[in-house]
């Protein structure tokens, strides 16, 4: 396949009718005759800005004219001084390009100047000089194209390179999938639409494991294995395993390779539901470490003291099933510790502190870094992620599971398992692969494998660190813009962005700015340990008026669910919505245009709210689905929902239900077995208190399981479910979604139930 990477020529005389313009156009024509595309530009002043687009070029040819340097060279020792405008601009361009791309060829084109006239720091970045009156344009064109081809050929990582080659070769397919490279779609009108939408390349590259030259994902051979080794090098790990069905599966693989029935496991209560599924599947006995929460509903860190071995032992002894296991085997150690790193809202831990606290208490540490795969690539996150360059080994084997599709450039479900060997023993890949095989399809999607490969290779220095720094910079610029807008409104209301009170005025500042210090009011988590936690600045929680971090409601308020519906109807989709906050991420794909659009839409919402615009005008799609709101004003609806939240003190209730005591009545695997054997009762919400759930109960937001199979319903949780029932009935379209809650229509009214273990 021929990729589109033009040769970029930047010369102010490119379109001029003089000898310099004639010479550079002759070179451009010669390059085009060799089959390459040329992009000619005349603006020298925009070089630095254009350098940011170096990812689109095969090489650069930059003009240096005699009349730009001659006034500075005459009377000197022959070298142009540092302050010559041409040198200043050229250096700025070089620095901007090399910050992102160390390898793209750069040529200088001129009349008589040579390397004697340029500083060494510029010379060392060049691939050569092109002199206008020496070699023929045809010869120079071939030389330029050769260098560009060498550069482009080296870009592709192992698996992606072979997949492109295979798709290019046009081999007839006699294996699955049945569409045979997309041909089946061409035989049907609907198939034609599908083919035109996704394109030839995706369908030709959709192959199965019969294509031996691509290697095997299940056995980690060939180009697949080479790509996994390349990713391990880039992520400073000993091993990497690509996973094509998400980090939910990566987590289950780690657990099935480590945990057996009856093992005691230490788990972050804020863990993803896939960890709780793994507990159920493996028959483990979970002992939970409890994170903090603030009144915005933002999940905070587990206090540092909870990681102390003596406190962990107290938790183990307080769990009846763990206590029973210890009675049978007093030497039983917890099998694994799984920590959510980072939380959904961006709170991360100093991992080295955790490792030091635990000592040799565990043999396996697992950090669910679904939301933190970028941390290895910027010093901002030093010690704040599981595995990194120069990090000491511990007595424990360390796993990190990454969603490369969440923060990096992977496509959906692209994930990877990253491993660091313990200091005492090497990791047994063959044993681990037995668990890998249990959870991996024998028909993996090769586009996802290629995505894992490319996403890792894109993070190679210097490009990867530059992408992460750019994300941090854009996130801080967004925060500054929001504060500027708020300041200009004076005493009037506007949205806030949750974070430290002080921001660096320019640049990305210091990571110390983002540390969660003990009792800082802004975070609302109380007396945290010093230097133990940090807020990842690329995660931004936007707070709406109506509730403060102390849990106090204002007289008026704007529930976040209304704001995010408004944004969605204006083409802006957020990641997560809470009661009075919503969450956005500054991934490596975020642009200035995107976050500036967010700022302007929030200002537009303010105007529409202040003017109490009717919902039929500002939320027409929503009103078409829920006509009961047609004549309601935007401000009126906000106040109606706010009044209900306030009357029920819902912020405090949702915080307390997660912090309330959860009584384990059965092992999760035993409770789920009751579900499988149909030994359950479908219990109405009003009768749930004291019953034992057989399922995961997960409210959205925040999407964190509230109860797991085998735990008993308490009064606080039942009160929340009663509130959700009444709220959903009163405000259709703004319903609280709770996974595990079964809705059934009885006598024209929706009633809610939960499947519980039969008494």
Question: Predicted regions: what is each one?
Answer:
Residues 4-19, 61, 265-268:
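Short hydrophobic beta-strand segments
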Residues 41-45, 50-53, 63-67, 81-82, ...:
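Conserved PLP-enzyme active-site core in the AAT-like
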Residues 11-13, 60-68, 289-292, 542-545:
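Short loop/turn segments at strand-loop or loop-helix junctions that form parts
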Residues 238-240, 262-265:
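Short active-site oxyanion
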Residues 2-5, 20, 24-33, 42-60, ...:
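Non-catalytic terminal extensions of PLP-dependent enzymes
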Residues 13-16, 66, 108-116, 135-136, ...:
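Short beta-alpha junction loops
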Residues 201-249, 754:
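Conserved N-terminal alpha-helix of the aminotransferase class I/II PLP-enzyme fold
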């Amino acid at each position: 396949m021929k990729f589109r990477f033009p040769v970029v020529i930047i010369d102010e005389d490119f379109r001029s009718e003089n000898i310099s313009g004639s010479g550079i156009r002759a070179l451009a024509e010669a390059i085009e005759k060799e089959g390459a595309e040329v992009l000619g530009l005349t603006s020298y002043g925009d070089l630095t800005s254009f350098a940011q687009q170096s990812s689109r070029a095969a090489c650069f040819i930059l003009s240096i004219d005699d009349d730009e340097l001659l006034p500075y060279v005459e009377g000197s020792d022959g070298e142009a001084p540092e302050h010559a405008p041409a040198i200043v601009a050229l250096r700025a361009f070089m620095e901007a390009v090399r910050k992102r791309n160390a390898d793209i060829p750069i040529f200088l084109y001129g009349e008589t100047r040579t390397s004697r006239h340029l500083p060494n720091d510029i010379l060392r970045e060049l691939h050569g000089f092109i002199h206008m009156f020496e070699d023929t344009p045809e010869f120079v064109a071939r030389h330029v194209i050769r260098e560009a081809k060498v550069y482009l050929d080296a870009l592709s990582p192992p698996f992606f390179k072979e997949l492109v080659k295979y798709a290019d070769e046009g081999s007839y397919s006699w294996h699955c999938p049945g569409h045979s490279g997309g041909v089946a779609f061409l035989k049907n009108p609907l198939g034609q639409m599908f083919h035109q939408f996704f394109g030839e390349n995706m369908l030709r590259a959709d192959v199965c494991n019969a294509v031996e030259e691509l290697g095997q994902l299940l056995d980690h051979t060939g180009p697949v294995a080479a790509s996994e080794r390349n990713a391990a090098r880039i992520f400073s790990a000993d091993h990497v395993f690509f996973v094509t069905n998400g980090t939910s599966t990566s987590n289950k693989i780690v657990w099935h390779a480590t945990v057996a029935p009856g093992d005691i496991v230490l788990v972050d209560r804020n863990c993803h539901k896939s960890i709780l599924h793994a507990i159920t599947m493996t028959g483990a006995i979970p002992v939970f470490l409890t994170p903090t929460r603030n009144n915005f509903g933002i999940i905070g860190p587990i206090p540092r003291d909870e990681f102390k071995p003596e406190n962990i032992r107290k938790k183990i002894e307080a769990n009846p099933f763990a206590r029973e296991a210890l009675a049978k085997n007093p030497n039983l150690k917890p099998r694994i510790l799984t920590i959510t790193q980072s939380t959904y809202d961006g709170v991360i831990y100093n991992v080295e502190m955790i490792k030091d606290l635990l000592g040799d208490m565990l043999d396996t540490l697992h950090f669910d870094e679904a939301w933190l795969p970028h941390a290895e690539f910027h010093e901002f996150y030093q010690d704040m992620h599981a595995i990194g360059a120069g990090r000491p080994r511990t007595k424990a084997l360390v796993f990190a599971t990454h969603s490369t599709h969440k923060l990096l450039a992977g496509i959906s479900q692209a994930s990877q398992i990253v491993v660091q060997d313990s200091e005492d023993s090497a990791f047994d890949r063959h044993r681990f692969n037995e668990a890998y095989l249990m959870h991996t399809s024998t028909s993996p999607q090769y586009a996802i494998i290629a995505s894992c490969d490319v996403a890792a290779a894109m993070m190679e220095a210097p490009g990867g660190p530059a992408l992460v720094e750019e994300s941090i910079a854009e996130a801080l610029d967004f925060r500054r813009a929001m504060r500027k807008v708020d300041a200009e409104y004076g005493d009037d209301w506007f949205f806030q962005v949750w974070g430290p009170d002080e921001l660096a005025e320019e640049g990305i500042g210091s990571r110390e700015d983002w540390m969660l210090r003990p009792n800082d009011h802004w975070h609302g988590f109380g007396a945290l340990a010093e230097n133990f936690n940090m807020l990842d600045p690329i995660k931004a929680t936007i707070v709406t008026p109506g509730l403060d971090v102390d849990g106090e409601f204002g007289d008026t308020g704007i529930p976040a669910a209304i704001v995010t519906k408004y944004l969605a109807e204006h083409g802006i989709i957020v990641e997560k919505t809470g009661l009075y906050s919503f969450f956005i991420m500054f991934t490596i794909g975020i642009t200035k245009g995107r976050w500036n659009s967010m700022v302007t839409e929030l200002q537009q919402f303010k105007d529409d709210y202040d003017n109490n615009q009717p919902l039929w005008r500002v939320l027409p799609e929503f009103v078409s689905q829920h006509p009961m709101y047609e004549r309601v004003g935007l401000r009126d609806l906000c106040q109606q929902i706010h009044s209900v939240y306030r009357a029920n003190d819902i912020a405090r209730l949702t915080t307390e239900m997660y912090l309330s005591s959860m009584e384990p009545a059965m092992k999760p695997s035993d409770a789920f077995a009751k579900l499988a054997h149909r030994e359950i009762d479908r219990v109405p919400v009003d009768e749930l208190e004291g019953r034992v759930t057989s399922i995961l109960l997960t409210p959205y937001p925040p999407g964190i399981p509230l109860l797991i199979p085998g735990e008993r319903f308490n009064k606080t949780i039942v009160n929340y479910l009663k509130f959700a029932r009444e709220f959903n009935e009163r405000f259709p379209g703004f319903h609280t979604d709770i996974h595990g809650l079964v809705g059934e229509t009885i006598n024209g009214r929706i009633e809610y139930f939960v499947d519980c273990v039969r008494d």
